[in-house]
């Protein structure tokens, strides 16, 4: 029992530390883009800033709106963080926490459940801003999960299995990002939209919704939402590296490729304005859905066609 707890602790603490320093990196990058230093006071070069932010948030009193549903209100951020950490369990970086033959389907299933934590937080806050932000987030995540699912199905047709280890062996000769670059580009843009990041951060339209679905949260519950969001960002980058960039040869290779993808996320946030909501939906349903569906049909029919030709010969 004690060893199991230690195993869980050792598996998830590096994820939370990576999340903490991703926030510091983001603030530094945005600072330099805006020709300023960013955090540089707490600790050497500002390295202790994430710890100071976390301590400040967790020692603050969590304020409950008088008209909210308290049980759902405080359960939603815990659910968000639990689901974000569950996503990491089948990832074989050093040693997977659980070995799953259907790891890709597990990832899709858990990522789709995160919609419920956002919906619960928006509804239980009993605030119009929070509810509108939650509705936007749910619509956006459901829309882009369709294209993510179709892209993964296309890759499964090419690789021939649902296990992440099979993606490693399939990329020994050439990365899937080179052979399937349209799928790779659509996948990356869809992951940005799935994690509600700029330029697809319609859920946090500050000029319209103040802060979106988490507008009524403060202190520890807000920090849990924050940790869940950045854990999802890191996980999507790790998954992108595993699926498309053949990031399985060394932990250093994984770290470098994930760092480059995270840098693209931060570059997008510093550079691009927010999409209009109708443009966001048109991109999902009128561009990505037909294209990913067509590529799925192509990738599904080609092996059948060539196997039929081989059998005839």
Curated annotation (Swiss-Prot):
The EC number(s) given in the record are 7.1.1.2
GO function term, MF aspect, one: NADH dehydrogenase (ubiquinone) activity
Gene Ontology BP term (one)? aerobic respiration
- Its main subcellular localisation, reduced to a broad class, is mitochondrion
Q: Locate the transmembrane regions by residue number.
A: 2-22, 72-92, 102-122, 148-168, 173-193, 222-244, 249-268, 293-313
Q: Please give the catalytic activity noted in the UniProt record.
A: a ubiquinone + NADH + 5 H(+)(in) = a ubiquinol + NAD(+) + 4 H(+)(out)
Topology class, membrane: Multi-pass membrane protein
**Sorted UniProt keywords:** Electron transport, Membrane, Mitochondrion, Mitochondrion inner membrane, NAD, Respiratory chain, Translocase, Transmembrane, Transmembrane helix, Transport, Ubiquinone
* Subcellular localization, as worded in the UniProt entry: Mitochondrion inner membrane
Query: What task does this protein carry out?
Result: Core subunit of the mitochondrial membrane respiratory chain NADH dehydrogenase (Complex I) that is believed to belong to the minimal assembly required for catalysis. Complex I functions in the transfer of electrons from NADH to the respiratory chain. The immediate electron acceptor for the enzyme is believed to be ubiquinone.
**Name of the molecule in the record:** NADH-ubiquinone oxidoreductase chain 1
Taxonomic source organism: Branchiostoma floridae (Florida lancelet)
């Amino acid at each position: 029992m004690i060893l199991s707890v230690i195993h869980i602790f050792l598996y998830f603490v590096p994820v939370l530390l990576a999340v903490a320093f991703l926030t510091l990196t983001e603030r530094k990058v945005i600072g330099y883009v805006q020709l300023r230093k960013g955090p540089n006071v707490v600790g050497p070069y500002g390295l202790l800033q994430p710890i100071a932010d976390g301590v400040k948030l967790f020692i603050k009193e969590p304020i409950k709106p008088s008209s909210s549903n308290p049980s759902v209100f405080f359960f939603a951020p815990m659910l968000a963080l639990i689901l974000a950490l569950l996503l990491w369990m089948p990832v074989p970086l050093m040693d997977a926490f659980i070995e799953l033959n259907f790891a890709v389907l597990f990832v899709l299933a858990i990522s789709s459940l995160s919609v419920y934590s956002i919906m619960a937080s928006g509804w239980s806050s009993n605030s119009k801003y929070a509810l509108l932000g939650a509705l936007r987030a749910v619509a956006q995540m459901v829309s882009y999960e369709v294209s993510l699912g179709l892209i993964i199905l296309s890759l499964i047709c090419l690789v021939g299995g649902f296990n992440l280890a099979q993606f490693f062996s399939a990329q020994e000769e050439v990365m899937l990002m080179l052979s399937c670059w349209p799928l790779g580009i659509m996948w990356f843009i869809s992951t940005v939209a799935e994690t509600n990041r700029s330029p697809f951060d319609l859920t946090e339209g500050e000029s319209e919704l103040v802060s979106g679905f988490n507008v009524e949260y403060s202190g520890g519950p807000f920090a849990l939402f924050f940790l869940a969001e950045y854990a999802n960002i890191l996980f999507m980058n790790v998954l992108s590296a595993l699926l498309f960039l053949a990031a399985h040869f060394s932990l250093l290779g994984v770290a470098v490729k994930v760092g480059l993808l995270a840098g693209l996320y931060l570059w997008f946030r510093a550079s691009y304005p927010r999409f209009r909501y109708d443009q966001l939906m048109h991109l999902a349903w009128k561009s990505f859905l037909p294209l990913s569906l067509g590529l799925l049909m192509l990738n599904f029919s080609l092996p059948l066609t060539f196997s039929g030709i081989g059998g005839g010969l």
